[in-house]
Design a protein with these regions (language model features):
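Terminal accessory/targeting
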Residues: 1-81, 97-106, 165, 213, ...
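Phenylalanine-focused residue identity feature
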Residues: 5, 26, 84, 108-109, ...
Length: 285
């Protein structure tokens, strides 16, 4: 039996309120407008290109079978957002295959540097499959991006430029700070006030910044087996009715892709519906 809750809007609002709760363990930064386009022209929401579904939608605009139901429906299932950082890479095709097989969406917080240039076309493939593309970093070098607020936004501008051939810039609405919004490494390079400044600037510019409350721990240094990755995710999700799961599709996290079918199966068996990060935000609007 699948559990139900009042509405998708109510669940999304709950997630937002949880951002100020220490017990929640993740944060969502809400902004009133979309980010300024690369051209610096007036902010005009751009629909997806012909034939490309919006995030969380399948071909023709139909809902992905595993995605969360629309707010108009009376019931709401427990929600899970699968998110992947640090790709695309050689690991990403296996991640996309698992998502397609299970018919569920995910959100990819991408990087774009000299190490993964040949994999950037996978961004288009992910978007066309109904996944959401979001921003992480061009370089992911803490010493560079966190030396100042200006350096951080220069890195984001470069990332947007590099991925522009593969995704409609007007559809990219979210970002994740490398290390998360509560990271301590930024203090080493930019001072104690830097992250607060960046969060404020992100919201002023229209970006939605996103943390997590469940982690696969697949980028913590130790090489994990697929079983360990799955256990970290499912164990961290037990008892939660809203999950934003941090995983990685970097070149060194192949076991995460191996674990993904089991992870998805566990969430389905527990009655969760799958959605992208922006689906949660859009329910608030």
């Amino acid at each position: 039996m699948q559990r139900s809750f009042p509405t998708l809007r109510a669940a999304a609002r709950w997630l937002l309120l949880a951002a100020v709760s220490a017990a929640a363990g993740f944060a969502l930064g809400v902004a009133a407008s979309r980010p300024a386009p690369l051209s610096q022209a007036a902010v005009i929401p751009t629909p997806p290109p012909a034939g490309q579904p919006a995030p969380g939608r399948g071909p023709g605009g139909s809902s992905l079978p595993g995605a969360a139901p629309p707010a108009s429906q009376a019931e709401l299932l427990p929600l899970v957002c699968l998110t992947f950082d640090d790709g695309p890479s050689r690991t990403t095709p296996a991640v996309l295959a698992a998502l397609e097989e299970a018919e569920v969406p995910a959100t990819f917080f991408v990087v774009a540097n000299e190490n993964n240039e040949s994999y950037l076309p996978l961004i288009r493939q992910a978007a066309q499959a109904g996944c959401e593309i979001a921003l992480h970093s061009a370089s992911h070098r803490y010493s560079d991006i966190y030396r100042s607020a200006g350096a951080f936004w220069e890195d984001i501008a470069l990332l947007r430029q590099r991925i522009a051939p593969y995704v409609d810039d007007g559809e990219v609405r979210c970002l994740r700070f490398p290390g998360g919004s509560t990271n301590t490494v930024s203090r080493k390079y930019g001072g104690d006030a830097l992250m607060g400044q960046l969060k404020e600037q992100a919201e002023e510019q229209g970006w939605r910044w996103v943390d997590w409350n469940v982690s696969a721990e697949d980028a913590a240094g130790k090489k994990l087996s697929a079983e360990e990755v799955c256990r970290n995710v499912t164990g961290g999700s037990a008892g939660l009715e809203r999950c934003i799961v941090l995983m990685h599709d970097s070149a060194t996290t192949g076991t995460t892709a191996e674990a993904l079918p089991s992870i998805i199966r566990w969430y389905k068996e527990e009655g969760y519906a799958f959605c992208t990060v922006s689906q949660l935000y859009d329910a608030l609007e």
